[in-house]
Amino acid sequence: MAKSVFNFFHFEILEYLNRFVYHSQYFLPYYCSLEVLGKSRKNWTFQYWCLYITTDKKIIKKKDFYHR
């Protein structure tokens, strides 16, 4: 059960990241880290950061939080 719940949230996070990247000036991230900061019965808080390659070939790191 726990694995399927995590897989569901992991897929949801990837969808969120894809939407973020699509509407930004960055290429797709080539490395990401995801960490669960807190969880209750109905709410989850994730912290994630990704390394992106920009259109001018620079590498940047972006960090954000995701609440569900």
Curated annotation (Swiss-Prot):
Protein name: Uncharacterized protein YOR011W-A
Superkingdom classification of source: Eukaryota
Source organism of this protein record: Saccharomyces cerevisiae (strain ATCC 204508 / S288c)
